[in-house]
Amino acid sequence: MNSLSIFFIVVATAAVCLLFIQGYSIYENYGNIKEFNATHAAFEYSKSIGGTPALDRRVQDVNDTISDVKQKWRCVAYPGNGFVSASIFGFQAEVGPNNTRSIRKFNTMAQCIDFTFSDVINIDIYNPCVAPNINNVECQFLKSVL
């Protein structure tokens, strides 16, 4: 064996030893790792200290690029009529004849979530808080859920 092959054997042995040491370290601290992950799981997709939002890129939805809480879309119970999708922009709307807009209502929370966070690109929005209807019941409800 020449000196070059001995050098490579020593480097390979050191690399394998480092892998074993790392594996043993994880094995010894596995309980602490699980406790840390359980404690901080609620912050998994929250905004980081550095100012860059940590996004879940596995599933794309309408809230991925929004950091203001009031702008995020959410499904809320509508008084007496199921559920609606709301944000500071207004409610998701149904467009009727003569381009009239009304609040899109859903029978179940699951239907609301499926529609709100689906891949629908063209979403009609109805904001009851624009003039002249600033003090109507729908506007008061929108302000109360934000």
Curated annotation (Swiss-Prot):
Give a yes or no for keyword NADP in this entry.
Answer: no
Q: Which InterPro entries match?
A: Poxvirus_A28
Where does this one sit in the cell? Virion membrane
Short name of one Pfam family for this protein? Pox_A28
> Where in the sequence is the signal peptide annotated?
none
One cellular component GO annotation, for this chain's record? membrane
| Predominant location | virion
Protein's membrane topology = Single-pass type III membrane protein
Q: Which residues lie on this side of the membrane: Intravirion?
A: 22-146
- Source superkingdom: Viruses
Q: How is it modified after translation?
A: Contains two intramolecular disulfide bonds. They are created by the viral disulfide bond formation pathway, a poxvirus-specific pathway that operates on the cytoplasmic side of the MV membranes.
Tell me the subunit arrangement: Part of a stable entry-fusion complex (EFC) which is at least composed of proteins OPG143, OPG147, OPG155, OPG086, OPG094, OPG107, OPG104, and OPG099. Formation of the viral membrane is necessary for the assembly of the complex. Interacts directly with protein OPG107.
**Any idea what job this protein has?**
Envelope protein required for virus entry into host cell and for cell-cell fusion (syncytium formation).
Q: What is this protein called?
A: Envelope protein OPG155
Q: What is the protein's species of origin?
A: Variola virus (isolate Human/India/Ind3/1967) (VARV)
Cite the source lineage: Viruses, Varidnaviria, Bamfordvirae, Nucleocytoviricota, Pokkesviricetes
